[in-house]
Amino acid sequence: MNPSSRFLKLLNIHPGEWPLVQKLFSLQFFQGAGIALFFTAAISQFLEKFPISELAYVFIISAFLLWIAGIVSNKLEHKLSLQKLSVVMTLIMATSMLFFWLGEFVFSGNWFYYIMLAWFNVLYLINNLEFWGLAAQLYDVRQSKRLFGVISSGDIPAKFLGYTIALLAIPFIGTQNLLLAGFFGMLFSLFFNLKQFSHENKKSKSVSYYLS
């Protein structure tokens, strides 16, 4: 569905830019909602089992996990194309959410909940690296000044929706199953990820054909 020219003008979006803006906004929206659901499940279960003073250890664990995630991300950046890197990052986030959901049936130690809550920070890092890496490559400097605020705004309603869904859904599905809901949200974002590259590939082919 194409928005009205008045709406595009209000957001300072040129008509030809709307398809990509829409896909990036949707990507950020569903990933943000998935991470919000994951965080709700992780923090709720952690505080149910441990005093708030234990959060200090979570931050220490987070520091090590973020360091490792940064190294791995840097290695992948040099080995994979932008498209493959983005898909791999999305799959890592989705798979990790599924792992923690399954892990609650398998692992009984307290350490598991420390790792799960610390992993939220890793998810947030990967999401930002993926999204802004895509945006920086797909837009030039002039476009970025106009559009970065628009495409990144998907994160705000995503968090609102994610936390609202968590509040309403917990009495019916339980806190643990929010992890599974987050997994599906992250997996659905993959659709917009692949769709945006399909759009860019078609655009590149048409430009190449015109130039030839």
Model-assigned labels for residue ranges:
Residues 1-25, 52-53, 80-84, 91, ...:
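Intracellular loop-helix junctions on the cytosolic face of multi-pass helical membrane proteins
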Residues 20-73, 112-170, 208-212:
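Substrate-agnostic recognition of the 12-TM MFS/MFS-like secondary transporter fold
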Residues 31, 65-67, 92-103:
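A generic, lipid-embedded transmembrane alpha helix
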Residues 71-83:
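A short N-terminal interaction module
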Residues 75, 94-97, 134:
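Generic beta-strand or strand-like secondary-structure segments
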Residues 98, 131, 200:
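Short, basic/polar, glycine-containing "phosphate-handling" surface segments that engage DNA
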